[in-house]
Structures are given as structure tokens and as C-alpha cells.
Amino acid sequence: MMLYPSIDNLLLKIDSKYSLVTVAAKRARYMQLENDKGVLPSYQSDKFVGKALEEIHAGKLVLQNDDK
């Protein structure tokens, strides 16, 4: 079974699996708690984590480094 978006494509957007999971989990939690419908016009996934991963793949959700 193929998953969308693929992990390979997602790692082109966020270079670390740990960071990818953290960003997706935080966004999914926010969507759930705030009843946020998301920033994309439509989603393939019905679940919050899937929607967050789709937003990362679309470039709508990015990781900002606060390194100084």
C-alpha cells in the first residue's frame, strides 16, 4: 500500500524524521483542539496527522530553525 505523501517526498521538505514527526504532531494537535479545517482546499486524508503531512508536502507548513 502506498502512502501519500511518501516519506521520501516529505524528507525533501524537512530533513529529519524526528523534526518531521514533531511538526506534524504539533500541527495535528492544534487542528484537533482548535477545530481548524486546515489551509488546503481539500485533503486526501480524513485524519489530522494525514492532513498535517499533506500541508508539509504542499509547502504550507514549514519548520523554522531558531538557531542563533
Swiss-Prot record:
Entry keyword annotation includes DNA-binding: no
Family indicated by similarity: Belongs to the RNA polymerase subunit omega family.
Tell me the superkingdom of the source: Bacteria
The GO cellular component terms are: DNA-directed RNA polymerase complex
**Sorted alphabetically, which NCBIfam families does this protein's record hold?**
rpoZ (TIGR00690)
SMART domains per the UniProt record, alphabetical:
RNA_pol_Rpb6
Q: Name a biological process GO annotation.
A: DNA-templated transcription
Catalytic reaction list: RNA(n) + a ribonucleoside 5'-triphosphate = RNA(n+1) + diphosphate
Which PANTHER family has this protein been placed in?
DNA-DIRECTED RNA POLYMERASE SUBUNIT OMEGA (PTHR34476:SF1)
Q: What is its EC number?
A: 2.7.7.6
Keyword field:
DNA-directed RNA polymerase, Nucleotidyltransferase, Transcription, Transferase
This protein's gene is called rpoZ
Name of the protein in its database record: DNA-directed RNA polymerase subunit omega
